[in-house]
Amino acid sequence: EAAGLIPFPRVG
């Protein structure tokens, strides 16, 4: 979802 954001770049 928020790919690129720290600390958890989650790919949903």
UniProtKB/Swiss-Prot annotation:
Record key words, sorted: Amidation, Neuropeptide, Secreted
GO biological process, one term: neuropeptide signaling pathway
Biological role stated in the UniProt entry: Mediates visceral muscle contractile activity (myotropic activity).
Modified residues (Glycine amide): 12
Superkingdom as given in the UniProt entry: Eukaryota
Family membership: Belongs to the periviscerokinin family.
Protein name per its UniProtKB record: CAPA-Periviscerokinin-1
Subcellular location field: Secreted
Entry-linked InterPro entries: Periviscerokinin (IPR013231)
Keyword Secreted: yes
Cellular component aspect of the GO annotation: extracellular region
